[in-house]
Each structure stands twice: as C-alpha cells, then as structure tokens.
Amino acid sequence: MDIKSVCFFFGGIRFLILNNVQETESLAALLKDVQTRREAFPDLVKRYQRPVYGVVRKMVISHDDADDIVQDVFVKVWHNIDKFKGESSLFTWIYRIATNECLQFLRKKRNRQWLGGDVSEELAEKLVSDNFIDGDEVQMKLQKAILTLPDKQRLVFNLRYFEELSYEEIAAITDTSVGSLKASLHHATRKIEEFLQE
C-alpha cells in the first residue's frame, strides 16, 4: 500500500472553504472596515475554526493544545486584520498564521525539554492516549511515521496529503518556493515509506 492510498484511507478531508470566492472576498472587505469588523468576525471564526483546528491538531496531536493554539490564531487574526493586504486569499493568510503558531509551539516545547525527552515520542504517546486515531493499525503506523519528520516537513506533508492543498497554496502558506516544497515532500514521502516497511 503506497502513501497516497494510506492517506486517502485515513480520510483526510479538505474542507471546502473557498466554495464561494465572492462570499470570502466580501467577508474580507467587511473585516477590513472598522465599522463592520465586529459583526463579521464571528462569521470568519465560524468558517475557518474547524479546518484550522484540523491542521493544528495534526501537528500538535493533543486536543487541549490544539484548542489553545486555535484560540491564539484567531486572537492574532483579530489584532492583525489591518495587516491583511489581500495579496493572498484570506484562507492562505489565516493558515499561515496557524502554521506559524504550530511551529512556534513545537519549537518552544523542544526548548523546554532540553537534554530531556524526545518531543516526537511524547507526541506519539499522545497519539495513542488522546484518541487521535480511531484504532486502525495502518493509520496509527502512518501517523507515527509522520511524527518522525522534522516539523516543517511534517507540516508540508499534512497540508499536501491530508488537506489536499496545491503546491502553490502550500508555498503561499509556508512562504517557500514550489521547487523546495516538492523536494521536501519527496524526502518526507521516502522517509515515511521506509518507516512503513520496517
């Protein structure tokens, strides 16, 4: 079984956020206007909270940590909405904030565990204890393999295979070139395949 079929089997669902581009653009316009921002913000949270939670949860595994990070993401969105220039989609901008928050959280976690335990091992333990996976052995092995990847590589892998984002979308979110992404994804896929064959 190859990685693509395992990922598909895992049930990676991309939420159809951008199903109505005009609606998204009008929401962005309402958020930029100081007078309508307070009314529009709950719509933004309603639209993006679930998919942002999915991305964050795949990175930090723990439900409680994911909830905290998602809350921080939307606080940052609220405080920085004036900085949204519309050069990318609202989706991309919010996902960039979310992925940066995840990477920062994991970096801090590693720094706190200096000389001590392995963060990947801790996440693997949470994978089992936090009911992240609904029991299937293949899914569990895949998730453990993904946890062996460096954080940014794991993020790219998750965005590509589970969120089913295009290379261009991932490049915009991670501020990386498409060529670098493809190379990173190739290495990640090879590492995961090796882990699954053990």
Residue ranges and their predicted role:
Residues 61, 74-89, 109-110:
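Sigma70-family region 2
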Residues 4, 103, 142, 153, ...:
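DNA-recognition helix of helix-turn-helix
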Residues 23-25, 112-135:
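Internal acidic/polar
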Residues 156-160:
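A short pre-motif secondary-structure segment
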Residues 1-51, 58, 147, 198:
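N-terminal module of bacterial RNA polymerase sigma factors
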Residues 83-85, 96-116, 193:
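Arg/Lys-rich amphipathic alpha helix in sigma70-family domain 2
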Residues 64, 168, 179:
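Residues within helix-turn-helix
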Residues 54, 68-75, 88-100:
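Structural recognition of an alpha-helix C-terminal capping motif at a helix-to-coil junction
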